[in-house]
C-alpha cells in the first residue's frame, strides 16, 4: 500500500487513471474489495479503516458477513436524504452484529468570512438527533471549511498542517 504520514492507504482509485470511471457490478466490486482487504500486505496494524460508499449495498453486507469487524462508524451529512442512508447503515450493521461505534456529522455548518457566524445550510444537528434516537454515541461534527479543502487537495492532513487549528481539534475530539 501507499504510505503517507505513517498511514497506509489503498484505493481502487490508485488502480485506474483519474478520468477512468469504475463502472463495476457487484461481483467486480466484491472481488476488488476482497483483494484490497486480504491481498494487500498491510503489515502490523493498530486499525484498518475501510471507507465505503453510503447505504447498505453488496460491499457493506459482504464485508460485514465475511470479516470480523470490531465496529462501524457512520458518517452522514445533516440533511434528511443523507440521514436515510445513515439509518439504513446503522440498522444493517446492528442486524449483522457489527457494533456501531458512533455517528459523525460532516458538513454540519460553515462559518461566514464576513459575519463570522455559523450557517447551517443542510439542516441542524440531524446526525446528533439520529444518534440519540438509536442510542449510539454522537462522535462530533465537522464544518464545511475552505482551508480544510485546500489542505486535503494539497495532501496536507489538517492535524499535521495546523495541529492547534479548530479542524485538527475537532478531528482529535472525534478520534
Model-predicted regions and their roles:
Residues 20, 74, 114, 158-160:
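Short beta-alpha connecting loops at secondary-structure transitions
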Residues 27-31, 125, 132, 169:
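Residues on a specific face of well-ordered alpha-helices
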Residues 30, 34-38, 61-64, 87-90, ...:
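Predominant activation on well-ordered alpha-helical scaffold segments within soluble catalytic domains
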Residues 1-49, 69-71:
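Nucleotide-state-sensitive switch-loop elements of NTP-binding domains
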Residues 10, 33, 52, 65, ...:
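Glycine-rich phosphate-binding loops of nucleotide-dependent enzymes
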Residues 26, 53, 164:
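Conserved phosphate/pyrophosphate-binding and hydrolysis machinery centered on Walker-type P-loop NTPases
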Residues 46-47, 53-151:
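Conserved catalytic-core segment of NTP-binding enzymes
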Residues 154-167:
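C-terminal boundary of histidine-terminating zinc-finger modules
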Amino acid at each position: 500500500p501507499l504510505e503517507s504520514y505513517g498511514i497506509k492507504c489503498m484505493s481502487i482509485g490508485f488502480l485506474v487513471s483519474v478520468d477512468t470511471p469504475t463502472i463495476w457490478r457487484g461481483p467486480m466490486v466484491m472481488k476488488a474489495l476482497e483483494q484490497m482487504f486480504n491481498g494487500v500486505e498491510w503489515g502490523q496494524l493498530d486499525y484498518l479503516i475501510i471507507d465505503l460508499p453510503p447505504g447498505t449495498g453488496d460491499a457493506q453486507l459482504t464485508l460485514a458477513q465475511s470479516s470480523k469487524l470490531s465496529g462501524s462508524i457512520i458518517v452522514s451529512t445533516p440533511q434528511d436524504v443523507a440521514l436515510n442512508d445513515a439509518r439504513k447503515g446503522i440498522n444493517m450493521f446492528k442486524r449483522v452484529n457489527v457494533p456501531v461505534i458512533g455517528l459523525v456529522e460532516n458538513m454540519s455548518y460553515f462559518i461566514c468570512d464576513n459575519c463570522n457566524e455559523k450557517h447551517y445550510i443542510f439542516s441542524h444537528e440531524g446526525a446528533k438527533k439520529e444518534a440519540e434516537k438509536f442510542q449510539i454515541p454522537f462522535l462530533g461534527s465537522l464544518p464545511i471549511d475552505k482551508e480544510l479543502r485546500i489542505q486535503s487537495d494539497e495532501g496536507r492532513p489538517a492535524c499535521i498542517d495546523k495541529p492547534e487549528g479548530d479542524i485538527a481539534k475537532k478531528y482529535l475530539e472525534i478520534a
